[in-house]
């Protein structure tokens, strides 16, 4: 997740930055076009997204009977426990808890038949959902730190951080449901196509 998820979604952020500037975004008057080109290389440097996703679902979350996932879950739950006590963040803590549960259930559903071809057929949407869940945790932690430092959000940067956290929880985290649907059902729409069909 730390390698491949950012290489995919940071490029999307760069693309949106170009779009926000309109025609000017594609000129050298602003650095966003250079950022896009530089960030596009990350997807190449970090290896194939699908390979990283298959390694995550096929090996990393299963290692030592899921110990790594349990440790990550415990850290996320500790952050959620702090956030539940903050009225502005309690709903986000609950939403993150639900997302974490969905990822755990999808991990089990993917491997329900024990067939690696079925389990890994949707490794990419699994990693997208898992990555979004991890980022939701990071945003919850950022929101906690922001409110501790500036409870009234009197500093513009504090208001910006809280706005970004709200955005992620309202617009990005809900996407995991669609991604995990195909993981849960072990959908083979893409994997079942023969090479000749392409």
PLM regions with names:
Residues 7, 11-15, 54-58, 70-73, ...:
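Predominant activation on well-ordered alpha-helical scaffold segments within soluble catalytic domains
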Residues 1-71, 167-189:
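Alpha-helix capping/hinge segments and adjacent helical runs
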Residues 63, 78-198:
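C-terminal amphipathic alpha-helical interaction region
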């Amino acid at each position: 997740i730390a390698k491949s998820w950012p290489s995919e979604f940071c490029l999307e952020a760069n693309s949106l930055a170009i779009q926000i500037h309109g025609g000017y975004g594609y000129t050298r008057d602003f650095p966003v076009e250079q950022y896009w080109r530089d960030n596009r290389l990350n997807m190449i440097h970090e290896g194939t997204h699908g390979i990283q996703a298959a390694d995550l679902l096929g090996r990393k979350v299963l290692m030592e009977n899921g110990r790594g996932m349990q440790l990550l879950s415990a850290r996320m739950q500790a952050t959620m426990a702090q956030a539940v006590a903050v009225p502005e963040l309690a709903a986000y803590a609950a939403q993150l808890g639900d997302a974490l549960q969905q990822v755990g259930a999808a991990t089990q559903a993917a491997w329900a038949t024990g067939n690696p071809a079925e389990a890994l057929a949707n490794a990419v949407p699994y990693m997208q959902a898992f990555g979004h869940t991890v980022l939701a945790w990071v945003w919850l932690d950022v929101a906690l730190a922001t409110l501790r430092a500036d409870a009234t959000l009197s500093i513009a940067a504090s208001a910006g951080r809280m706005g970004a956290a709200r955005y992620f929880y309202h617009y990005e985290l809900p996407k995991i449901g669609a991604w995990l649907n195909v993981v849960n059902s072990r959908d083979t729409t893409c994997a079942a196509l023969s090479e000749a069909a392409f």
